[in-house]
Regions:
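Structural preference for solvent-exposed beta-strand-turn elements
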Residues: 1-368
Protein backbone atom coordinates (compact mmCIF):
# COMPACT_ATOMS: atom_id res chain seq x y z
CA UNK A 1 0.00 0.00 0.00
CA UNK A 2 1.36 3.38 -1.02
CA UNK A 3 -0.56 6.68 -1.01
CA UNK A 4 -0.49 10.42 -0.32
CA UNK A 5 -3.24 12.18 1.62
CA UNK A 6 -4.13 15.54 3.16
CA UNK A 7 -3.09 15.77 6.82
CA UNK A 8 -6.30 17.63 7.70
CA UNK A 9 -8.52 15.00 6.05
CA UNK A 10 -6.54 12.18 7.65
CA UNK A 11 -6.78 13.68 11.13
CA UNK A 12 -10.50 14.32 10.72
CA UNK A 13 -11.13 10.73 9.64
CA UNK A 14 -8.97 9.22 12.39
CA UNK A 15 -10.74 11.28 15.05
CA UNK A 16 -14.12 10.16 13.72
CA UNK A 17 -13.30 6.46 13.71
CA UNK A 18 -11.11 6.26 16.83
CA UNK A 19 -14.17 6.76 19.05
CA UNK A 20 -15.22 3.19 18.19
CA UNK A 21 -11.90 1.73 19.39
CA UNK A 22 -12.09 0.28 22.94
CA UNK A 23 -9.80 1.79 25.58
CA UNK A 24 -8.99 -1.69 26.88
CA UNK A 25 -9.29 -5.00 25.07
CA UNK A 26 -8.00 -8.55 25.32
CA UNK A 27 -7.96 -8.76 21.51
CA UNK A 28 -4.97 -6.67 20.32
CA UNK A 29 -6.32 -6.03 16.82
CA UNK A 30 -9.31 -4.15 18.29
CA UNK A 31 -6.88 -1.48 19.49
CA UNK A 32 -5.96 -0.91 15.85
CA UNK A 33 -7.60 0.87 12.94
CA UNK A 34 -7.94 -0.83 9.59
CA UNK A 35 -6.50 1.25 6.74
CA UNK A 36 -7.28 -0.01 3.24
CA UNK A 37 -7.34 1.58 -0.19
CA UNK A 38 -10.53 1.87 -2.25
CA UNK A 39 -11.50 3.23 -5.66
CA UNK A 40 -12.22 6.57 -3.96
CA UNK A 41 -9.12 6.80 -1.77
CA UNK A 42 -8.55 5.48 1.76
CA UNK A 43 -11.07 3.76 4.02
CA UNK A 44 -10.44 3.81 7.78
CA UNK A 45 -12.39 1.45 10.06
CA UNK A 46 -12.57 0.77 13.80
CA UNK A 47 -14.69 -1.48 16.00
CA UNK A 48 -15.18 -2.79 19.53
CA UNK A 49 -17.32 -5.69 18.19
CA UNK A 50 -20.53 -3.95 19.36
CA UNK A 51 -20.07 -0.79 17.29
CA UNK A 52 -18.23 -0.38 14.01
CA UNK A 53 -17.38 2.88 12.24
CA UNK A 54 -15.78 3.40 8.84
CA UNK A 55 -15.19 6.45 6.69
CA UNK A 56 -13.62 7.09 3.29
CA UNK A 57 -11.46 10.07 2.38
CA UNK A 58 -9.83 11.13 -0.90
CA UNK A 59 -6.24 10.01 -1.40
CA UNK A 60 -3.74 9.73 -4.24
CA UNK A 61 -3.25 5.95 -4.30
CA UNK A 62 -0.11 4.68 -6.03
CA UNK A 63 -0.52 1.02 -5.07
CA UNK A 64 -3.44 -0.67 -3.27
CA UNK A 65 -3.31 -2.59 -0.02
CA UNK A 66 -4.24 -2.55 3.63
CA UNK A 67 -2.90 -2.86 7.18
CA UNK A 68 -4.07 -2.35 10.76
CA UNK A 69 -2.29 0.34 12.79
CA UNK A 70 -2.43 1.22 16.53
CA UNK A 71 -5.27 3.76 16.71
CA UNK A 72 -4.08 5.88 19.62
CA UNK A 73 -0.48 6.28 18.43
CA UNK A 74 -1.44 7.00 14.82
CA UNK A 75 -3.91 9.69 15.88
CA UNK A 76 -1.38 11.26 18.28
CA UNK A 77 1.26 11.40 15.54
CA UNK A 78 -1.04 12.85 12.87
CA UNK A 79 -2.37 15.44 15.31
CA UNK A 80 1.15 16.88 15.74
CA UNK A 81 2.20 16.83 12.08
CA UNK A 82 2.80 20.05 10.14
CA UNK A 83 0.16 21.18 7.58
CA UNK A 84 1.61 19.25 4.64
CA UNK A 85 0.63 16.16 2.60
CA UNK A 86 1.12 12.84 4.41
CA UNK A 87 2.69 9.87 2.65
CA UNK A 88 1.80 6.38 3.89
CA UNK A 89 3.74 3.30 2.78
CA UNK A 90 3.00 -0.18 4.13
CA UNK A 91 5.90 -2.65 4.01
CA UNK A 92 4.37 -6.10 4.07
CA UNK A 93 1.49 -6.77 6.45
CA UNK A 94 2.87 -5.47 9.74
CA UNK A 95 4.83 -2.27 9.20
CA UNK A 96 3.83 1.17 7.95
CA UNK A 97 5.96 4.25 7.32
CA UNK A 98 4.57 7.77 7.57
CA UNK A 99 6.22 10.92 6.21
CA UNK A 100 5.08 14.54 6.43
CA UNK A 101 7.51 17.35 5.66
CA UNK A 102 10.67 16.45 7.55
CA UNK A 103 8.84 14.19 10.01
CA UNK A 104 9.21 10.42 9.58
CA UNK A 105 7.67 7.62 11.61
CA UNK A 106 7.41 3.83 11.44
CA UNK A 107 4.73 1.89 13.26
CA UNK A 108 4.19 -1.83 13.74
CA UNK A 109 0.75 -3.06 12.81
CA UNK A 110 -1.12 -6.32 12.34
CA UNK A 111 -2.29 -8.07 9.16
CA UNK A 112 -5.63 -6.78 7.91
CA UNK A 113 -7.10 -10.29 7.74
CA UNK A 114 -7.01 -10.36 11.55
CA UNK A 115 -9.39 -7.38 11.69
CA UNK A 116 -13.02 -8.43 12.37
CA UNK A 117 -15.43 -8.17 9.46
CA UNK A 118 -18.32 -5.76 9.83
CA UNK A 119 -21.81 -7.33 10.10
CA UNK A 120 -23.55 -8.40 6.92
CA UNK A 121 -26.34 -5.88 6.33
CA UNK A 122 -28.39 -5.85 3.12
CA UNK A 123 -29.12 -2.28 2.06
CA UNK A 124 -31.58 -3.47 -0.59
CA UNK A 125 -34.24 -3.27 2.13
CA UNK A 126 -33.02 0.04 3.54
CA UNK A 127 -35.03 3.15 4.36
CA UNK A 128 -34.09 6.82 4.51
CA UNK A 129 -34.49 9.61 7.03
CA UNK A 130 -33.01 13.06 7.45
CA UNK A 131 -29.91 12.98 9.65
CA UNK A 132 -31.00 16.12 11.50
CA UNK A 133 -34.22 14.40 12.62
CA UNK A 134 -32.29 11.44 14.01
CA UNK A 135 -29.84 13.77 15.75
CA UNK A 136 -32.70 15.65 17.39
CA UNK A 137 -34.24 12.42 18.69
CA UNK A 138 -30.93 11.15 20.04
CA UNK A 139 -29.91 14.45 21.58
CA UNK A 140 -33.10 14.75 23.65
CA UNK A 141 -33.49 11.16 24.88
CA UNK A 142 -30.22 9.19 25.15
CA UNK A 143 -29.25 10.90 28.41
CA UNK A 144 -32.04 9.06 30.24
CA UNK A 145 -30.82 5.47 29.66
CA UNK A 146 -29.90 3.31 32.62
CA UNK A 147 -26.23 2.70 33.41
CA UNK A 148 -26.97 -0.26 35.70
CA UNK A 149 -26.43 -3.76 34.32
CA UNK A 150 -29.28 -5.37 36.27
CA UNK A 151 -31.79 -4.59 33.48
CA UNK A 152 -29.83 -4.65 30.19
CA UNK A 153 -32.91 -3.72 28.15
CA UNK A 154 -32.88 -0.27 29.79
CA UNK A 155 -29.24 0.25 28.74
CA UNK A 156 -30.51 1.09 25.25
CA UNK A 157 -32.71 3.67 23.54
CA UNK A 158 -35.98 2.43 22.04
CA UNK A 159 -36.44 3.67 18.47
CA UNK A 160 -39.96 3.25 17.08
CA UNK A 161 -40.79 3.98 13.44
CA UNK A 162 -44.54 4.19 12.89
CA UNK A 163 -46.86 5.15 10.05
CA UNK A 164 -46.80 8.92 10.54
CA UNK A 165 -44.19 9.46 13.22
CA UNK A 166 -40.90 8.21 14.59
CA UNK A 167 -39.93 8.41 18.24
CA UNK A 168 -37.13 7.59 20.65
CA UNK A 169 -37.64 6.70 24.31
CA UNK A 170 -35.12 6.14 27.09
CA UNK A 171 -35.59 5.42 30.79
CA UNK A 172 -33.80 4.10 33.85
CA UNK A 173 -37.02 3.33 35.71
CA UNK A 174 -36.93 6.60 37.68
CA UNK A 175 -36.94 9.13 34.84
CA UNK A 176 -37.96 8.93 31.19
CA UNK A 177 -37.43 11.02 28.05
CA UNK A 178 -39.60 10.70 24.92
CA UNK A 179 -39.48 12.64 21.67
CA UNK A 180 -41.45 12.10 18.48
CA UNK A 181 -41.32 13.79 15.10
CA UNK A 182 -43.38 13.42 11.91
CA UNK A 183 -42.22 10.67 9.53
CA UNK A 184 -43.43 10.12 5.98
CA UNK A 185 -41.54 6.96 4.99
CA UNK A 186 -43.07 3.53 4.43
CA UNK A 187 -40.79 1.52 6.75
CA UNK A 188 -42.15 0.47 10.15
CA UNK A 189 -40.30 -1.22 13.00
CA UNK A 190 -38.63 -0.80 16.36
CA UNK A 191 -35.14 -1.35 17.73
CA UNK A 192 -33.24 -1.00 21.01
CA UNK A 193 -29.89 0.66 20.34
CA UNK A 194 -26.95 1.28 22.71
CA UNK A 195 -26.47 5.02 23.35
CA UNK A 196 -22.77 4.80 22.48
CA UNK A 197 -23.68 3.83 18.92
CA UNK A 198 -26.28 6.59 18.69
CA UNK A 199 -23.70 9.10 19.87
CA UNK A 200 -21.51 8.13 16.89
CA UNK A 201 -24.49 8.62 14.56
CA UNK A 202 -25.23 12.01 16.11
CA UNK A 203 -21.58 13.06 15.90
CA UNK A 204 -20.52 11.80 12.48
CA UNK A 205 -23.35 12.61 10.07
CA UNK A 206 -24.07 16.24 9.10
CA UNK A 207 -27.62 17.35 9.92
CA UNK A 208 -28.48 18.15 6.30
CA UNK A 209 -27.53 14.69 4.99
CA UNK A 210 -30.01 11.92 4.30
CA UNK A 211 -29.22 8.72 6.18
CA UNK A 212 -29.70 5.31 4.66
CA UNK A 213 -30.52 2.72 7.33
CA UNK A 214 -30.79 -1.05 7.10
CA UNK A 215 -31.19 -3.95 9.53
CA UNK A 216 -29.12 -7.11 9.61
CA UNK A 217 -29.80 -10.19 11.72
CA UNK A 218 -28.96 -8.42 14.97
CA UNK A 219 -27.42 -5.16 13.80
CA UNK A 220 -28.52 -1.79 12.51
CA UNK A 221 -26.41 0.08 9.97
CA UNK A 222 -26.43 3.80 9.18
CA UNK A 223 -24.63 5.15 6.15
CA UNK A 224 -24.09 8.23 4.02
CA UNK A 225 -21.99 8.37 0.85
CA UNK A 226 -18.67 8.26 2.77
CA UNK A 227 -19.37 7.13 6.35
CA UNK A 228 -20.98 4.05 7.92
CA UNK A 229 -21.90 3.15 11.51
CA UNK A 230 -22.86 -0.39 12.54
CA UNK A 231 -24.43 -1.17 15.91
CA UNK A 232 -25.33 -4.38 17.66
CA UNK A 233 -28.96 -4.28 18.82
CA UNK A 234 -30.13 -5.05 22.35
CA UNK A 235 -32.56 -7.96 22.29
CA UNK A 236 -35.76 -8.30 24.28
CA UNK A 237 -39.10 -6.56 24.80
CA UNK A 238 -38.92 -2.95 25.97
CA UNK A 239 -41.17 -2.09 28.94
CA UNK A 240 -44.58 -0.60 28.15
CA UNK A 241 -43.52 2.97 28.86
CA UNK A 242 -46.79 4.45 27.63
CA UNK A 243 -48.75 3.10 30.60
CA UNK A 244 -46.61 4.99 33.12
CA UNK A 245 -47.07 8.39 31.44
CA UNK A 246 -49.85 10.14 33.40
CA UNK A 247 -52.83 11.54 31.47
CA UNK A 248 -54.69 13.09 34.39
CA UNK A 249 -52.16 15.33 36.14
CA UNK A 250 -54.31 18.24 37.35
CA UNK A 251 -51.67 20.42 38.98
CA UNK A 252 -49.77 22.57 36.48
CA UNK A 253 -46.86 24.95 37.05
CA UNK A 254 -45.25 27.17 34.41
CA UNK A 255 -41.70 27.99 35.48
CA UNK A 256 -38.79 29.93 34.02
CA UNK A 257 -36.23 27.25 33.17
CA UNK A 258 -33.10 29.21 34.04
CA UNK A 259 -34.48 30.31 37.41
CA UNK A 260 -35.50 26.74 38.23
CA UNK A 261 -32.06 25.45 37.29
CA UNK A 262 -30.33 28.05 39.45
CA UNK A 263 -32.47 27.27 42.50
CA UNK A 264 -31.96 23.51 42.12
CA UNK A 265 -28.19 23.97 41.81
CA UNK A 266 -28.18 25.96 45.06
CA UNK A 267 -30.20 23.26 46.82
CA UNK A 268 -27.91 20.53 45.46
CA UNK A 269 -25.03 21.92 47.51
CA UNK A 270 -26.62 20.73 50.78
CA UNK A 271 -28.69 17.83 49.42
CA UNK A 272 -27.80 14.23 50.24
CA UNK A 273 -25.10 12.70 48.04
CA UNK A 274 -27.14 9.48 47.96
CA UNK A 275 -30.71 10.62 47.23
CA UNK A 276 -30.23 14.25 46.08
CA UNK A 277 -33.70 14.80 47.60
CA UNK A 278 -35.20 18.29 47.27
CA UNK A 279 -38.64 19.18 48.62
CA UNK A 280 -40.76 21.35 46.30
CA UNK A 281 -43.79 23.13 47.81
CA UNK A 282 -46.18 24.55 45.19
CA UNK A 283 -48.65 27.33 46.03
CA UNK A 284 -50.69 29.86 44.05
CA UNK A 285 -47.78 31.96 42.81
CA UNK A 286 -44.78 30.65 44.69
CA UNK A 287 -42.53 27.60 44.61
CA UNK A 288 -40.58 26.92 47.81
CA UNK A 289 -37.49 24.71 47.82
CA UNK A 290 -36.20 23.07 50.97
CA UNK A 291 -33.45 20.60 51.79
CA UNK A 292 -32.52 19.08 55.15
CA UNK A 293 -29.57 16.70 55.29
CA UNK A 294 -28.53 15.19 58.64
CA UNK A 295 -24.91 15.92 59.61
CA UNK A 296 -24.66 18.52 56.84
CA UNK A 297 -27.24 21.27 57.00
CA UNK A 298 -30.33 22.85 55.50
CA UNK A 299 -31.29 25.11 52.62
CA UNK A 300 -34.38 27.05 51.50
CA UNK A 301 -35.23 29.11 48.45
CA UNK A 302 -38.26 30.62 46.71
CA UNK A 303 -39.28 31.21 43.12
CA UNK A 304 -42.22 33.10 41.59
CA UNK A 305 -44.25 30.85 39.26
CA UNK A 306 -47.63 30.53 37.57
CA UNK A 307 -49.56 27.68 39.15
CA UNK A 308 -52.98 26.04 38.82
CA UNK A 309 -54.17 23.51 41.39
CA UNK A 310 -54.26 22.84 45.11
CA UNK A 311 -51.08 23.35 47.13
CA UNK A 312 -48.78 20.32 47.23
CA UNK A 313 -45.47 19.22 48.74
CA UNK A 314 -43.53 16.79 46.57
CA UNK A 315 -39.96 15.46 46.65
CA UNK A 316 -37.64 14.86 43.71
CA UNK A 317 -34.09 13.81 42.95
CA UNK A 318 -32.68 17.25 42.18
CA UNK A 319 -30.02 15.87 39.87
CA UNK A 320 -32.68 14.18 37.71
CA UNK A 321 -34.53 17.48 37.40
CA UNK A 322 -31.36 19.36 36.49
CA UNK A 323 -30.48 16.80 33.84
CA UNK A 324 -33.93 17.00 32.27
CA UNK A 325 -33.86 20.80 32.29
CA UNK A 326 -30.53 20.76 30.46
CA UNK A 327 -32.32 19.27 27.44
CA UNK A 328 -35.49 21.37 27.60
CA UNK A 329 -35.46 23.52 24.43
CA UNK A 330 -37.61 26.44 25.67
CA UNK A 331 -37.15 29.24 28.19
CA UNK A 332 -40.24 28.14 30.11
CA UNK A 333 -41.23 24.61 31.17
CA UNK A 334 -44.61 23.06 31.97
CA UNK A 335 -44.38 20.96 35.14
CA UNK A 336 -47.42 18.74 35.90
CA UNK A 337 -48.26 16.38 38.75
CA UNK A 338 -51.25 14.92 40.62
CA UNK A 339 -50.20 13.43 43.96
CA UNK A 340 -46.90 13.30 45.90
CA UNK A 341 -46.40 9.62 44.99
CA UNK A 342 -47.41 9.86 41.31
CA UNK A 343 -45.20 10.54 38.29
CA UNK A 344 -44.62 14.15 37.25
CA UNK A 345 -44.01 15.39 33.70
CA UNK A 346 -41.97 18.21 32.23
CA UNK A 347 -42.58 19.60 28.74
CA UNK A 348 -41.35 22.63 26.78
CA UNK A 349 -43.86 25.48 26.92
CA UNK A 350 -44.70 27.34 23.67
CA UNK A 351 -42.26 25.26 21.64
CA UNK A 352 -42.64 26.25 17.98
CA UNK A 353 -41.37 22.94 16.59
CA UNK A 354 -42.95 20.03 14.79
CA UNK A 355 -41.43 17.67 17.36
CA UNK A 356 -43.19 16.66 20.59
CA UNK A 357 -41.08 16.27 23.73
CA UNK A 358 -41.96 14.94 27.17
CA UNK A 359 -39.90 13.95 30.19
CA UNK A 360 -41.18 12.05 33.21
CA UNK A 361 -39.68 11.83 36.68
CA UNK A 362 -40.79 9.74 39.64
CA UNK A 363 -41.03 11.58 42.98
CA UNK A 364 -39.16 10.66 46.15
CA UNK A 365 -40.89 10.02 49.46
CA UNK A 366 -40.60 12.97 51.79
CA UNK A 367 -39.34 12.33 55.31
CA UNK A 368 -40.03 14.57 58.30
Amino acid sequence: MRLTISREKLQEALSAVAAAVPAKTTLPVLGNLLLETTDRGLRISGTDLDIGVSTEIPADVESPGGITVPAKKLLEIVRELPPAPVRLVASGEQRIALECGRSKFKLLGLPRDEFPSFPAVDFKTSWRIRSGDVQQLIGHTAFAVSTEESRPILNGVLWEIRENETRMVATNGHRLAKMEIPYSGSFKGEFIIPPKALEQVRRLFPADEELEIAKGENHLAFRSPFTSVYSRLIEGPYPNYDQVIPRDNNRVALIDKQSLQSALKRMAVVASDQTHRVKLSFNAALLRFSVATPDLGEGQDELAIRYEGDPIDIGFNGMYLLEILRYMPTEEVRFTFKEPERAATLEPENWQERAKYLCLVMPLRLVD
